[in-house]
């Protein structure tokens, strides 16, 4: 069984499935699976790394504690390719923080977007943390924002900024925040509250 994020498309008979699998280091494999024993019948596609010939940003993932002091939050740092930890870099926090979305994933490049890669190539540190209220961590994790928008998830993002300020290469005087949709709400709220 391949490690990574799997998305299955089941055949009408239920006997076979197409398995789209991706991991931090594998862009995409597409396999035909026999459902009864989960055996790979055929690999239909094994996508090569499209960035293999390029000097790409480094992606680091890890955990910080939420504002409640006990919940582990997943984060992703996208770092300039030639990061020098003795220098200070401007940093952008990309935030969503709302329901039904997970930004730090176990698939290709841990879910880093083209924007993250682009900005890191230009000398920015890019940071994302999935605060409480985001998807795929269970009901209790997701429901802390129910009828309580802009409180717990904001406090978690502030914990993320505190973590960033502890890193030797982050310029604490040049940290920006960016988001769209619920992330736009979070961005505005963070700017006006903190």
Could you describe each region identified by the protein language model?
Residues 5-194:
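Serine-hydrolase catalytic core recognition
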């Amino acid at each position: 069984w391949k490690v990574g994020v799997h998305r299955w498309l089941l055949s009408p008979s239920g006997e076979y499935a197409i398995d789209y699998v991706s991991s931090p280091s594998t862009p995409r494999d597409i396999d035909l699976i026999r459902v009864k024993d989960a055996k790979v019948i055929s690999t239909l596609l094994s996508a090569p790394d499209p960035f293999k010939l390029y000097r790409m940003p480094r992606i680091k993932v890890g955990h910080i504690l939420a504002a409640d002091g006990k919940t582990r939050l997943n984060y992703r740092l996208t770092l300039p390719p030639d990061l020098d930890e003795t220098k200070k870099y401007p940093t952008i926090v990309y935030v969503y923080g709302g329901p039904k979305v997970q930004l730090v994933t176990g698939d290709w490049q841990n879910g880093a977007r083209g924007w993250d890669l682009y900005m890191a190539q230009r000398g920015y540190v890019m940071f994302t943390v999935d605060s409480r209220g985001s998807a795929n961590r269970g009901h209790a994790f997701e429901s802390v924002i129910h009828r309580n928008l802009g409180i717990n998830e904001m406090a978690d993002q502030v914990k993320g900024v505190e973590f960033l300020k502890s890193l030797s290469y982050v310029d604490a005087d040049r940290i920006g925040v960016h988001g769209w949709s619920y992330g736009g709400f979070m961005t505005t709220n963070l700017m006006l509250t903190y």
